[in-house]
């Protein structure tokens, strides 16, 4: 689950 969050954050940041 955390991997999905970091993936999305990486897309914005």
From Swiss-Prot:
Expressed by the skin glands. It is found in: Secreted. GO terms for cellular component: extracellular region. Its main location: secreted. Disulfide bonds: none annotated. Antimicrobial peptide with activity against Gram-negative and Gram-positive bacteria and fungi. Also shows hemolytic activity. This is Temporin-1SPa. The lineage of its organism: Eukaryota, Metazoa, Chordata, Craniata, Vertebrata.
């Amino acid at each position: 689950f955390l991997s999905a969050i970091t993936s999305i954050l990486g897309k914005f940041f």
